[in-house]
Amino acid sequence: MAYYRTPHDVTALPAWQALKDHRQAMQDFSMREAFNADPQRFSQFTLSSCGLFLDYSKNLITSETRDLLVNLAKEVGLSDAIKSMITGELVNASEGRPALHTALRRPVGDKLSVNGVNVMPEVHKVLNQITELVGRIHDGLWRGYTEKPITDVVNIGIGGSFLGPELVSEALLSYAQKGVRCHYLANIDGSEFHELSAKIRAETTLFIVSSKSFNTLETLKNAQAARAWYLAQGGSEAELHRHFIAVSSNNAAAVAFGIREENIFPMWDWVGGRYSLWSAIGLPIALAIGMSNFKELLSGAYTMDQHFQSAPFEQNMPVLLALLGVWYGNFWGAQSHAILPYDHYLRNITKHLQQLDMESNGKSVRQDGTPVATDTGPVIWGGVGCNGQHAYHQLLHQGTQLIPADFIVPIVSFNPVADHHQWLYANCLSQSQALMLGKTRAEAESELREKGLSEAEIAKLAPHKVIPGNRPSNTLVVERISPRRLGALVALYEHKVFVQSVVWGINAFDQWGVELGKELGKGVYNRLVGSDETLADDASTQGLINYFRGRHRG
């Protein structure tokens, strides 16, 4: 029976009990001692694939730990689950849908049936549609209402229609095509629109409205604001089609807005928003970096898909990262996971992975609606490397919580300045080393003696300088951030999230919690503007409504 129809209680599996027993045996495990005892530890716990090099040797694991985690993956039926997702079974059980983001990066000639229909020709038809549009804009053939070529593209979207495309277009800024600047408008806060509109000219700007329903509140409000601004700047209704296109499955609403049907790029219900950057949602990426680079991005993701499907679990990068997350979250009590990119252009990867991981695995019931028996997805947080060292790394080193971390770093910089990149890389490695090694009381006291402190001063200060160490981390190294490697990196985390959902028996492809907030928001809005005079369901919300109404002007 398919895993998504009859999810297991993972805590009842023999492999889970074996891991519980092993966790007790690992209570006094020391990474420092493990490295001293085994010169081959690094080679035993490293892996290279798809242009990525993973060092997972700085973890609270032995080869036995890895074997036990792999046994867990086998007992939960991970191989069948991977096949179910890739082949289009209804792995999104609550919505009765497949999750086929992997289809978006499959090559021409592949076949994949959904409800008896081969979807691959349609996938590549849309890719050709994107290619044509990108070519026209880059060649200056798409012109605005004053016949000037387009110089600025504004993507209006939120969530998956924003976070993934923004990550990729900024991460690949070194591949940006000259002549077209890409911007993102997501927040309904008017200040964001105000700042953006000051940077662009209506006559040379193309807006992409990205919303599957063409009814997402924030996106629709921003699209309406952009439309009003365009008209106020001298644009006309008759020429509006030159400045607005859409990525949506609601053609009627997009046409009613003023967008021509041939300029509406389709979305499919078998691709979730947080997995959609590979689709027409990635149009701003293609406009930013060019079509050949966009196809390289897809190709990189496809190589990771192939690795994920074919590599044995012991050598499978997404599977290993996922199982390590299960190990810490379910057996060591970790509640969060830090993403620490040591690359300026990857500064938004944490935001994308927050949505990817937390919206996917922030669940408390299994696929069949029964409560989970263990913790599920962690809080994902972090930020750019060296900046974080002077902010929150202190908590990683000496705080009371165990927080696993992923360090992500390139070997080559696109913008070398003196020896800056060598220092950047050194900082990345030294942080993971410090988390692992820590500093003992004896080492702290020895340092203070060398500085000439008295024994009384040493006794007072040494406890503050002790760093526990034994804090786990992974290090992902890429030679250089490229479209192909970035595609593999993002796909790596997509598959990691899926593997964990299979272990926990949850649905990684729905997000009902998000829907509740949307529903309640309408009622609060109606009370704020006075169109609904009934009281809110609770005194706190009503009190805050009254506070707003008593003070808001304009």
Curated annotation (Swiss-Prot):
It catalyses: alpha-D-glucose 6-phosphate = beta-D-fructose 6-phosphate. SUPFAM superfamilies: SIS domain. One of its GO terms (molecular function) is glucose-6-phosphate isomerase activity. The active site is at E359, H390, K518. Pathway: Carbohydrate biosynthesis; gluconeogenesis; Carbohydrate degradation; glycolysis; D-glyceraldehyde 3-phosphate and glycerone phosphate from D-glucose: step 2/4. GO terms for biological process: gluconeogenesis; glucose 6-phosphate metabolic process; glycolytic process. Its EC number is 5.3.1.9. The keyword Cytoplasm applies. GO terms for cellular component: cytosol. Keywords: Cytoplasm, Gluconeogenesis, Glycolysis, Isomerase. It is found in: Cytoplasm. Catalyzes the reversible isomerization of glucose-6-phosphate to fructose-6-phosphate. NCBIfam families: PRK00179.1 (NF001211). Belongs to the GPI family. This is Glucose-6-phosphate isomerase. The lineage of its organism: Bacteria, Pseudomonadati, Pseudomonadota, Gammaproteobacteria, Pseudomonadales.
